[in-house]
Swiss-Prot record:
Gene that encodes the chain: LATH
Species in which this protein is naturally found: Equus caballus
Protein's UniProt name: Latherin
UniProt GO cellular component terms: extracellular region
Tissue: Found in sweat (at protein level).
Gene Ontology process terms (BP): surfactant homeostasis; temperature homeostasis
């Protein structure tokens, strides 16, 4: 039987993208604090528990079974596999201006470990760092009033690294790249599809004053004159 499980913790840390477009901390702290509190109040990390890891495990099994059968003989089946997420951490959020100065990018960094067991292979633990990038775009209506619109939302894997203090066996070396690629695709596609709608809802319900502050930041950055 497939074994799928998740374990979550919160970590106050720092993992932000390096960019010359960073908003000054004294300006962005109020906004990132509100967003972080919204994520916690909305049990954002627990939403990962609903992500279908069984689909990821089946994908990995489909892709590595043939090669493992050649290397170690026919021995792999669904009942011989286990996958689980461990030690998921929400790190320090950050804001930056979009490159065209017409919006704001919210960066939500996550860290997690993926435990994977494929029958006789030694258990693997892969350390993952990924950023969720949420783009807020400045738009104006027919009356010239500005608003923030939820733009593109994506997960960008920063690193997928095997945690192992011992030399890897030949079978593990042979399939490691395939496993890492499958995990990267899962993060980009499935994880993003599961988490981005929640982020859209969170941003849509931000305090009006915070939204106005963001709009003013973008307008100032773009040197747009606004008559109130």
């Amino acid at each position: 039987m497939l074994k799928v499980s998740c374990l979550f913790v919160l970590l106050c840390g720092l993992l932000v993208p390096s960019s010359a477009q960073q908003i000054p901390p004294e300006v962005s702290s109020q906004i990132t604090d509100a967003l972080t509190q919204g994520l916690l109040d909305g049990n954002f990390l627990s939403l990962l528990n609903a992500i279908n890891l069984e689909g990821l495990l089946n994908t990995i099994l489909d892709q590595v079974t043939g090669l493992l059968n050649i290397l170690v003989g026919p021995l792999l089946g669904p009942s011989d596999a286990e996958i689980k997420l461990q030690d998921t951490r929400l790190l320090q959020l950050s804001l930056e201006f979009s490159p065209d100065s017409k919006g704001i990018d919210i960066w939500i960094p996550l860290e997690l470990s993926v435990y994977l067991k494929l029958l006789i292979l030694e258990p693997l633990t892969l350390y993952v760092r990924t950023d969720i990038r949420v783009q807020l775009r400045l738009e104006s209506d027919e009356d010239g009033k500005y608003r923030l619109a939820f733009g593109h939302c994506s997960l960008l894997p920063r690193a997928i690294e095997l945690q192992s203090g011992n030399p890897l066996s030949l079978p593990v070396n042979a399939v490691l790249g395939t496993i890492e690629n499958a995990l990267g695709n899962f993060i980009t596609e499935d994880l993003g599809a599961g988490l981005c709608p929640t982020l859209n809802s969170l941003v849509s319900n931000l305090d009006l004053q915070l939204v106005n502050n963001l709009i003013n930041l973008i307008l100032d950055r773009a040197n747009v004159d606004l008559s109130v």
